[in-house]
From Swiss-Prot:
This is Probable RNA methyltransferase Y17G7B.18. GO terms for biological process: methylation; snRNA modification. The lineage of its organism: Eukaryota, Metazoa, Ecdysozoa, Nematoda, Chromadorea. Probable RNA methyltransferase. Keywords: Methyltransferase, S-adenosyl-L-methionine, Transferase. It is an enzyme of class 2 (transferase). Its EC number is 2.1.1.-.
Length: 378
């Protein structure tokens, strides 16, 4: 119960004369309405009628407006909430002189590598494909009677290891290895000495018979005048680009070999000379085979082209125009070029991934069709 008696004014708010404006009416004896209309916000504030939440939001708005009027800072760095500079991730890092020099050296090495090996003429090819002391597994699927007392050509022979093994183990009448890289041809010729048996008389880097048959290595690039089926007198290496410059030159090609090998080179021919060069290569091989001869190819898959196409702008341009894919080779070689059949030897294993490729053997008919389209117009 309150201690004040009924009707007492103790503790109640008192209103004095100067609290309200003078005047008034019957409906507004204290004249409150006129004060509110003249300055409603000020009157509400004086009477304590303002909404505190509204007042706070207005204050925040005023503060925000004041901040927005501050001049913008012309700084290249973004600032975090603690007002400290923060690195822009889009700006390239500043390299030291040593780092710039190392980057330039790497760039030069890459350019040198791409220019030197644009034909797939890698000088460590067999080191990647084979384990030390291991024989080439592709020899296991070849038949000796394909080569024995026959004439063979190995296109893209590299350092000559496979060519030398065929010359020594399969006894061809002659086998010639050709490569576009002169350095590799020099290495292949030197390797002849290492494949000779101990009883073979060796003079310098080559068998003694080479001086009579071939002359000085530096003086000769052409094949020797005569061959013997006995190794090492049945083998020679020479620098040559097998892809002719034009289709018209195909008319001059004559049958010369019983076996032509084109192992792991189709990708490089395709990238360097495009679809026209690839077709011209196959037509020359067909024309250079005797009736009943064999073309042995080891085509690379088309999905392996993309990586090597980046080696130069020319290779990249040729790659973008390729329509004659490796999966189209078989039908075109049989139906258009004139091969009689194809024997698939399967996939041969290798030390490194990517070298496990199928080997196909195309057979030229004993009696080629005389009504076939001339080679220069296929």
């Amino acid at each position: 119960m309150s201690s004040h008696r009924r009707g007492s004014f103790r503790g109640r708010k008192r209103f004095y004369r100067d609290t309200f404006a003078p005047g008034g009416s019957k409906t507004d004896p204290l004249n409150i309405e006129i004060e509110l209309t003249e300055n409603p916000e000020e009157e509400k504030k004086r009477l304590g009628l303002l909404d505190p939440t509204t007042e706070r939001s207005k204050k925040r708005k005023v503060e925000k407006d004041e901040k927005s009027e501050k001049p913008a800072e012309n700084s290249p760095f973004k600032k975090n909430q603690y007002n400290s500079p923060r690195k822009d991730s889009r700006r390239p890092p500043q390299l030291s002189k040593e780092e710039k020099s190392a980057a330039e050296n790497r760039k030069q090495k890459t350019e040198y590598f791409n220019k030197k090996y644009r034909y797939g003429n890698f000088d460590r090819y067999y080191g990647i494909r084979l384990n030390p002391g291991e024989s080439d597994k592709r020899l296991s699927v070849f038949q000796k009677d394909w080569f024995e007392h026959k004439q063979a050509l190995d296109i893209g022979c590299n350092a000559g290891f496979l060519t030398l093994s065929i010359a020594k183990d399969f006894s061809p009448r002659r086998i010639i290895g050709i490569d576009i890289d002169e350095h590799l041809i020099g290495v292949a010729r030197k390797n002849i000495r290492h494949y000779c048996d101990h009883e073979t008389e060796v003079s310098g880097k080559f068998p003694a018979s080479f001086g009579v048959q071939f002359g000085t290595v530096s003086q000769r690039n052409e094949a020797p005048r005569s061959f013997s089926t006995k190794f090492p007198d049945n083998i020679w290496f020479k620098k040559e680009n097998y892809v002719l410059e034009s289709d018209e030159m195909l008319d001059m090609i004559q049958p010369e070999f019983d076996v032509i090998l084109a192992l792991s080179i189709t990708k490089w021919i395709h990238l360097n000379w495009g679809d026209d060069g690839m077709r011209r290569f196959f037509r020359r091989a067909y024309a250079q085979l005797h009736p009943g001869g064999r073309l042995i190819i080891e085509p690379q898959a088309f999905d392996s082209y993309k990586k090597r196409a980046k080696m130069s702008e020319e290779l990249k341009a040729n790659y973008s125009k390729i329509e004659f894919k490796p999966e189209d080779f078989e039908m075109w070689l049989i139906e258009t070029v004139g091969f009689e059949s194809v024997e698939k030897l399967g996939v041969v294993g290798a030390k490194s991934k990517g070298f496990e490729r199928p080997i196909d053997v195309y057979l030229k008919p004993l009696h080629p069709k005389t009504d076939a389209i001339p080679l220069g117009y296929i």
